[in-house]
Structure formats: C-alpha cells, structure tokens
Regions:
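Interaction-mediating elements
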Residues: 1-215
C-alpha cells in the first residue's frame, strides 16, 4: 500500500482462505462441515434443493464447485451467482479486517456512506505512526466493497512505518484473493501533492527508500 494510491482486488473464484470462509459462512448463516483438511458448504440458503450434495468445498485454499449444479438451469446459475456474490462480499470484508488488524490497524465505520446497487460497503482501517516528530501520525485507508466482492482501496499520505505495515497486509490480501495486483492496472498512482513530494517514499512507483527513526 503506497501513499496516494488506489488499488483494486479482484476475487479469483478458485481460491479461498479456509479460516476466512468459515467466518463468512457463520456471518451468512450457511451450513458447512469440516472434514479433515476440507471445508464443505452444504447449504447457502438457496432456493434450489441440492439433494444432499455440496455447493462448494475448499481443500487447502483451492475451491471446487458442484459441477452438476453449475451446469443446471440458467435460473439456478443466476441464483448461485447472487449467492456467491454475497459470500464474496463477506469474504472480502473479513479478509481486510483479518490482515489489517494483524498489523495493528483498527476498524472505523464510514457513517456518511450510503450503499448503492454497485457499492455495498465502505469503511476505513486506521493506523498510527510511531515515527519520531511525524506531524501526521494518523492514517486512514478507505475500503469500498462492490456487490461482487471486488475491493477498491484509496489512500493519501501514509507515514513510512505505516506504509510498510499496510504493504504487508495488502500482500496477504493478494494471497487470500488469489490474484496479484499489477502496477498500472489494478494499482493506480495518484498525483502526489507538492507538500509531500519531499517524502522520498511518496514516489511515483510507491517504493520505500528513506530511513525512519521510531521512538
């Protein structure tokens, strides 16, 4: 995560973190079982009767879908897509919370956010710098979750120590989403205001270069 950056996290449907999936299922009220090293989703409150078959299962972090029902009627496929989108939204939020809280960030609601058909959640993860004499020690990174589980982040100035922690969390998010963001495609750099151009790590490519002193 760089200063003045917007990133997009796209969910790879073939990859899921089991711990996050279990928490998402609990949040959604879905029925699941754990069998050895597999998490198996048996019921997602869908209208269609699966006749005792599973909806999806995850072994390691690899997802397998029930191919029989994936090939079924168009209406059911549409319903399943809506079901999986709900899962992706909760999965996305749980992933963000898990990885950013692990490096010391805290959750902050966006009380001004009004959900739309496309944008369903928005909130901030907040971190505090420990750099000596840092004038802007508080960092808020904005997260917007779209209706299909895509995550869009937005940041402005980030102190260097928080920058490194956010980088760590973002890399873990890449792993959980099963996609690696690409510079200039999913990662977009914003123009750095003149005030911050002297900060060597607020560079065009987001690379850290300076040395910090933490009190």
């Amino acid at each position: 995560m760089s200063c003045f950056e917007s990133s997009k996290f796209l969910k790879n449907p073939q990859t899921m973190n089991q711990a996050v999936l279990i928490k998402a299922c609990q949040e959604l009220g879905w029925k699941y079982e754990i069998r050895q090293d597999e998490v198996i989703i048996l019921n997602a409150n869908q209208k269609e009767d699966l006749k005792g078959e599973y909806l999806l299962k995850v072994k390691g972090d690899v997802v397998s879908y029930n191919n029989y029902y994936m090939k079924n009627a168009k209406e059911f496929v549409t319903e399943l897509q809506e079901t999986f989108f709900k899962l992706n939204v909760v999965y996305a939020k749980e992933t963000i919370l898990k990885e950013f809280e692990a490096v010391g960030f805290t959750f902050k609601r966006d009380f001004d956010f009004v959900p739309t058909k496309e944008e369903v959640e928005r909130f901030y993860m907040v971190g505090y710098s420990k750099i000596e004499n840092e004038e802007e020690n508080k960092t808020e990174i904005q997260f917007t979750i779209l209706n299909d589980g895509t995550v869009i982040t937005d940041s402005n100035y980030i102190p260097e120590d928080i920058h490194k922690l956010a980088d760590e969390a973002m890399l873990k998010m890449d792993e959980a989403f099963g996609n690696k963001r690409r510079e200039g495609i999913e990662i977009k750099r914003k123009e750095v205001p003149i005030k911050y151009q002297g900060k060597t790590y607020c560079s065009a490519n987001g690379q850290l270069k300076s040395t910090i002193k933490i009190s």
